[in-house]
Amino acid sequence: MRRSDYLLVFLGALLLALSRLPLNLGWLVFIGWIPFLMVFERCNCRPRQLLWVAAIKAVVYILVVMYWIGAVTPPGLIGIVLVYTGFYFIAFYAIYRIYALLPKLRYMGFVAVLISFEYVQNFGETRFPWFNQAYSLADYTILIQLADLGGVVLLSLLCLLFNVLIYRLLAHKRRLQPLVIIILLLGLWLGYGHYCLRYKPLEKHEAQIHVMQPSIEQDLKWDEEQYYRSMALFQELTLKAVEDSARLVIWPEGAVTRYLRHDLQAQLDLKAILDTVKVDIFTGFPHFEPAPPGHRNQELYYNAATLVRPGPVFGELYFKNILVPMGERTLWLDTFPFLWVLNFQQANWEFGTKLEYFQSGNLEFSPSICYELAFPEIHHRMAIPWDGLQHRYRKCDYLVNITNDAWFGTSYGPWLHAMMAKFRAVENRIQIYRSANTGISLVVDPKGRILAQTRLFEVTNITAPLYTSPEITLQRRIHRWPMLVLAFALLITLLSCVKTMPRRS
């Protein structure tokens, strides 16, 4: 590899990173991989050089898009750079071998390997699907309508396909085939988006659901004296929502900082608020239960949430199913119990094991907590669960996401996290109400349009009419289709591995 190749890699990584930020540069995702295609086309990389390519991609992308991790845990930022350098090296090495040994499949292999790289990040305790290219399209609501057919994986696949087509057009200027395909694909893509936005029917309901954003600073949130100030603020904001005819008020993740189901004073404090406001409240709080015999700890701790009605009447508890790797739980504790001795100031919550569905008024919703918003599959099961008794899908009226993004500070993190709600809404054609402690709180309709949104650290409530759609999306029915892409990527990678690499001249 020449020095210019490393510069191309740096340029491509920078373009892809900038496409993710709220700078109206999402279109860069359609050309950001072209420098990488130019490098792979030369097919003269050694493994050590590919490791440098992977390191440049990981360092540039993570420092531009995810620099805010370093403000919370500098070792965590270093760790994620090292881990994804390894992941990118595996992906790039597979692509390199496909280019060198299966050249007729090189473009298909390029797309399939990178799609597989994104898709596998949805599984296992290390799951961290923040590298999905589809999220670069967050500003283009018309383009994300296609997510109801194939999810974010289909959107990412199209982004990569456009990179390949534009590269071929630039490399072979006299060939019109890539240009024709680009025009045809873009026309179909925009046409479907226009049809969905204009013609897909929605039913409007005056549900009077309000989302609270109290904006309590992370450094103060868990202070004992702050607890009383927080509860007073919650009552004040909830009363304002009631004055606006609220029937349900959604508080953020961990709003009640005490163990609500075990703390009598916290229950009395919440009862006093409920007696005053006389509306349903959905809130997050920490929770613990006795550990089973033989467990290392005496209690199991959960990141929990529930619906509370005047009385108070507590609903079933929802326990967060997907935890932030290392932030909320050390990896592989069940497999390697000796890891319990490690202390990185993480919480070590337990995994929730089931979803919950709540009824407020005559409307049904299912909740997710914080990081879970990044995962399409769990939201498919929340929004459109399978009814095993009647052997058919049924659909909730809306979804709720609560989060505490205070630790993001004023970085791009809250925006990146919040925009995922647009994709989850379109994938399932369902409205999402999102309460974030310090922002960004929002209401997104089933077409991915933001109906209401807060500013960072704004103290306020927001609301919007509820729009529902009876549609059971194709994506819900076939959401495992990326497994086919993964299988194809594995197959051609294995084929390239059994062939002998040609000698270098």
Give residue spans per PLM region.
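Membrane-embedded alpha-helical bundles of multi-pass enzymes
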Residues: 1-197, 402, 409-411, 451, ...
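Soluble catalytic domains of enzymes that build or remodel membrane lipids, polysaccharides, and related
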Residues: 197-481
